[in-house]
Amino acid sequence: MGPEELLTKSGVSRETLERLRLYADLLVKWQARINLVGPDTVPDLWSRHMLDSVQLFPLIKVGARRLVDLGSGAGFPGLVLAVMGAPDVHLVESDSRKCAFLREVARVTETPVTVINKRIEQVAPLGADVVTARALAPLDRLLGWAFPHLAEGGECLFLKGRGAEDELTASAKEWNITASRVPSLTDPGGLVLHLREVSRGRAQP
């Protein structure tokens, strides 16, 4: 899959596509120096990383004013969503080299973001309307990291693989959530977990 197919599948504008091309070019260049993504995924960058991130954009709640992406790494999905126009995006990443990459992509693509070079646990509550994450941790741990950053009525969009249902079951021991399951556009067995009404404490039978 290439950029033109992304255009067909997602409906992004030509302007956004060109900015994503710049992003992809920078990733390939930086990948030679630091391990931003799995080396075997680079040839399939537009599907494995770009489209995987782009698919979250229509799920962002109407009226959202701030998005926080946890464990941003190479910027998937948070920086891609910022390029597409998501509001007031904060990228949390502990690796300073990856933060340098995120800032360079933001500069070159003229995308306003806030890059936070800290461990998630060290970041003060950010009051996010939407929290995103991909391939970061099991759901119960991920909710523990995300919850302090959720504003009232905030939602989570988590990209998950084939174990998503098991993770939902395990998280129910500690968390109350309303979960929608959206089939992944890039992983036949994967899901986007759209979580609302998140609160700590086992639900009453």
UniProtKB/Swiss-Prot annotation:
Membrane-spanning segments: none
GO molecular function terms listed in the Swiss-Prot or TrEMBL record: rRNA (guanine-N7-)-methyltransferase activity
Residues annotated for S-adenosyl-L-methionine binding in this entry: G71, F76, I120, E121, R134
Subcellular localization(s) per the UniProt record: Cytoplasm
Protein name per UniProt: Ribosomal RNA small subunit methyltransferase G
Keyword rRNA processing in record: yes
Keywords: Cytoplasm, Methyltransferase, rRNA processing, S-adenosyl-L-methionine, Transferase
Physiological role: Specifically methylates the N7 position of guanine in position 527 of 16S rRNA.
Disulfide links within the chain: none
Family: Belongs to the methyltransferase superfamily. RNA methyltransferase RsmG family.
Lineage, highest ranks first: Bacteria, Pseudomonadati, Pseudomonadota, Alphaproteobacteria, Rhodospirillales
Organism (species): Paramagnetospirillum magneticum (strain ATCC 700264 / AMB-1)
UniProt keyword annotation of Methyltransferase present: yes
Cross-referenced HAMAP family: 16SrRNA_methyltr_G
